[in-house]
Amino acid sequence: MSSAATKATFCIQNGPSFEGISFGANKSVAGETVFTTSLVGYPESMTDPSYRGQILVFTQPLIGNYGVPSGEARDEYNLLKYFESPHIHVVGIVVAEYAYQYSHWTAVESLAQWCQREGVAAITGVDTRELVQYLREQGSSLGRITLADHDPVPYVNPMKTNLVAQVTTKKPFHVSALPGKAKANVALIDCGVKENIIRCLVKRGANVTVFPYDYRIQDVASEFDGIFLSNGPGNPELCQATISNVRELLNNPVYDCIPIFGICLGHQLLALASGASTHKLKYGNRAHNIPAMDLTTGQCHITSQNHGYAVDPETLPKDQWKPYFVNLNDKSNEGMIHLQRPIFSTQFHPEAKGGPLDTAILFDKFFDNIEKYQLQSQAKSSISLKVTYSTDKSRLQSINVTKLAKERVLF
């Protein structure tokens, strides 16, 4: 540690404050304070768009010991190899002890260097056990990190902002399955999608066309074999455009048989579009080891989770939906499944990276539904590269998806 280390303070609004040392960007920040008990995967967590606007507390006592891998490395699908999106989405991180010395064969820089380059505040030396105990008892709280030579910034509640609009792709983009492996065309509504979700789709043979969160999917659904609703940040009730579009899709009898799969925020938006309600959890569920029971089989699965809101299962229309999974820790809803149609969703992340892969089979279930839909539609075996989409939401035009961007469009 440098002898010129900058002192910093982490404060909870109307709560405790903690002294520490800054190892991130030279800035003070504010946001909603949440914690994760995940032992590994801090690069994936920090680049997960679901953490947008939040200060993330790590309960793992030593953070940064394996450095940070390349944010430029891509896999055979042209997806980011190590990150869940191109940039960090948390505004700050809080750790008990930062590992100034790091070692890993994939590392290209330290966690401190990465935070400084990305403009993310970071503080070490905080009693995270005491802090997390407070958050568990009082609930997720507004917090701020203030550097010693800075004036405190005002507390900010990001849950009052439509965070999805900040993280969604700005234009459609397309990710293809490997040559000769394509089985289906899937439309993905990007509310803050993680790279590994797209990977789980394309590696199973999907040509994935990703649309902005407010895109009128109901206008183009007939061009696809399945619809996917992604994860994302913030209060689901602020995504009214998505809710309205999904509701219109659900209410159109033309699409009665089209498969739909939602994860995390996508699960909540699907529930809201169906007439159910959501509520904010006291401190949320953010970990890689949360047990969820499949109510259709009685089996328990260990799941990866990152959410601060949940669906109220009692408000689901009982003639259409039933709960699919339940959290065995706090009994909150973890999924729902349609009684007549090939539609289901989960609150947890079956694509987990990092985390357990117990429920990755749900992607296979989605593709089983797609195969049945294709047979019902007498789909041809060849996969068309033609899709129809609206560039101005009022005029439809047919284009070749090979002309779309091949990665998310940030600006």
From Swiss-Prot:
Q: What keywords sit in the KW lines? A: Amino-acid biosynthesis, Arginine biosynthesis, ATP-binding, Cytoplasm, Ligase, Nucleotide-binding
What SMART domains does this protein's entry cite? Answer: CPSase_sm_chain
Quote the subunit structure annotation.
Heterodimer composed of 2 chains; the small (or glutamine) chain promotes the hydrolysis of glutamine to ammonia, which is used by the large (or ammonia) chain to synthesize carbamoyl phosphate.
* Residues where L-glutamine binds: 50, 232, 234, 265, 268, 306, 308-309
Glutamine amidotransferase type-1 domain span: 185-376
Output the Gene Ontology terms for molecular function.
Answer: ATP binding; carbamoyl-phosphate synthase (glutamine-hydrolyzing) activity; glutaminase activity
Question: What is the first-listed, main subcellular location in coarse terms?
Answer: cytoplasm
Named in its record, the pathway it takes part in is: Amino-acid biosynthesis; L-arginine biosynthesis; carbamoyl phosphate from bicarbonate: step 1/1
Q: What's the top EC group for this one?
A: ligase
**What protein am I looking at?**
Carbamoyl phosphate synthase arginine-specific small chain
Read off the SUPFAM superfamilies from this record: Carbamoyl phosphate synthetase, small subunit N-terminal domain, Class I glutamine amidotransferase-like
